[in-house]
Amino acid sequence: MTTLTARPEAITFDPQQTALIVVDMQNAYATPGGYLDLAGFDVSTTRPVIANIQTAVTAARTAGMLIIWFQNGWDEQYVEAGGPGSPNYHKSNALKTMRNQPLLQGKLLAKGSWDYQLVDELVPQPGDIVLPKPRYSGFFNTPLDSILRSRGIRHLVFTGIATNVCVESTLRDGFFLEYFGVVLEDATHQAGPEFAQKAALFNIETFFGWVSDVETFCDALSSTSFARIA
């Protein structure tokens, strides 16, 4: 078992019954010229987040944790995005940006596009699971819940973008399904001002889960490995 120092209190978990979730680390969310950038959100500080996720993924894989990568988006015709009868049609900033800038139609968050692809630095490995998702939450219209339950996984460690949107949405839904959710704060990034990051982390540590960081996470896993060897 591993005990991770976190806020508001430490949490103990078995790495082999825990999944590291990498949320939407796509060009759309982390790269200049991607959807968030084109929609007016600041992505200039995402590079350290990418590096921290690399570190967390390496440590988690070494410890025997399952790695799950999410990609947010829809088919090329945007049928999966929902039409005017869906609130997603009205609230998705990607869809609104394309309606306001018709030349971008078909380029944002469309499966197969550069925007949809994971950033170059983050490459899933054999044994990892890559899941598409059509909405903010990774539990909605995906096999995530059955994948986790069939493996006896009850603890989820979250990284990715955006903390205040897809990360928090997935962690909240996991909470309602009796999963223990931990966010590594320096391996996440918000969509919007910095206060959005702080508010999301406050919500998570106060109501829905736990908050830690990459160095503490890696140290905890390393200590567990040494203990097993001893």
UniProtKB/Swiss-Prot annotation:
Protein family: Belongs to the isochorismatase family. RutB subfamily.
This protein's name: Ureidoacrylate amidohydrolase RutB
SUPFAM superfamilies assigned to the protein according to its UniProt record, in alphabetical order: Isochorismatase-like hydrolases
Enzyme class: hydrolase
EC number assigned by the record: 3.5.1.110
Lineage: Bacteria, Pseudomonadati, Pseudomonadota, Gammaproteobacteria, Enterobacterales
Source organism per UniProt: Escherichia coli O45:K1 (strain S88 / ExPEC)
Keywords (A to Z) from UniProt: Hydrolase
Name of one Pfam family that matches: Isochorismatase
A molecular function (GO) term: hydrolase activity, acting on carbon-nitrogen (but not peptide) bonds, in linear amides
